[in-house]
Amino acid sequence: MNRAPLKRSRILHMALTGASDPSAEAEANGEKPFLLRALQIALVVSLYWVTSISMVFLNKYLLDSPSLRLDTPIFVTFYQCLVTTLLCKGLSALAACCPGAVDFPSLRLDLRVARSVLPLSVVFIGMITFNNLCLKYVGVAFYNVGRSLTTVFNVLLSYLLLKQTTSFYALLTCGIIIGGFWLGVDQEGAEGTLSWLGTVFGVLASLCVSLNAIYTTKVLPAVDGSIWRLTFYNNVNACILFLPLLLLLGELQALRDFAQLGSAHFWGMMTLGGLFGFAIGYVTGLQIKFTSPLTHNVSGTAKACAQTVLAVLYYEETKSFLWWTSNMMVLGGSSAYTWVRGWEMKKTPEEPSPKDSEKSAMGV
C-alpha cells in the first residue's frame, strides 16, 4: 500500500500528543477478519506486557540486588546498548544472507549519519540512564509514580516548541497526574522509603522521554525513516559516549573488584537484560502498528497498574490507602488524558492549515 509522506510538523504533533496516523491504522487493520485482528492484537499486547514487566524486574535485580551487590548502573546500561548494537548488526547480516526469511535493513556505519544522530543520542543516553538510575534508587512499586510526569512534559513541550495550546480538560488531567505524583512522594516519605535522588532521576527520565520524541522526528530523515537504523546509530553513539563516563565514575574499577565477574549466571542475566532492551523497541512498534498510539498509551497505563500490583506482591510490601490512591491518581490521570486527546482528535480535522504547519515548523 502506498502511503503519502507525513510532514515533519505533523509527525512531531503526533509524537507529542499521541495522535494516530489514519493510513497506518488502515494498513495495520487491512481487510482481515475481526476475530483474526482481535487475536493478533491480544497476542501483541500480551507480548508487550510480558516483555516490559520482565525487563523492569530484571533491571531492578541487576541494579539493586542484595545478592548481586553490583554498583555499576552506567556499565549495566552500556552493556545493554552493546547487546542491542550487536543484535542489529547480526540481524542485518542475516537478512543479507537470507533475504526471504529475515526482513531487516542493511546497516553500514556512516560517520556523517552518526554525527547527524548525535543530538538524539545524547537525549537517548539521558533517557535510558535516568530510567535505570531511578529504578536503582526507588522500588519497582513506586517506579511508575516516579516516572509519571512524561505526559506533563509532553504538554509543556507542545506549547514551547509547537506553540500548541492544550484544552482545559487535558490540563485538568495533567493536574491529577501532578497531584498523584506529589501524594506518592509524600506517602513514600511517610513510610520511610522515599529516595529523593531516585525521584529526581525519575523526573529527568520523564523529561528525556518527551525530548526523545521530538528529536526522533527531526533525525529520522537522516536514516531514511528507518527506526532500526536509528536504533543502531543511537546505540553505537551511546556505547562510545558511555566509555568516558565509565572511567570518570570509577565503574571499571568497581567492575574489576566485583566478586561475580567470572560468573556465567551474571553475564547470562546481563545479556538477557540486553535482549529485553532490544525486544521492547520491537514489541512497542508492533503494538502501535496493530492498534494505534492512543491505544498503546492505554495499554501502557494498564501495564503499569499490573506491574505495581505484581511488585507489591513479589516484594511482600504493605502500602497505605493514600499510597494506592496516589497510584490510581497517576494512572487515572494518564488514562483520562489519553481519552481526552482522542476525543479532541475526532472533533478536529487531522490536517493542520498551512499557517499552522509553518508555525509548528518554526517552533521546532
Curated annotation (Swiss-Prot):
Annotated keywords: Congenital disorder of glycosylation, Disease variant, Golgi apparatus, Membrane, Sugar transport, Transmembrane, Transmembrane helix, Transport
Disulfide bonds: none
Principal localisation: Golgi
GO biological process, one term: GDP-L-fucose biosynthetic process
GO cellular component: Golgi apparatus; Golgi membrane
Topology with respect to the bilayer: Multi-pass membrane protein
Similarity annotation: Belongs to the TPT transporter family. SLC35C subfamily.
Protein name: GDP-fucose transporter 1
Organism: Homo sapiens (Human)
Gene name linked to the record: SLC35C1
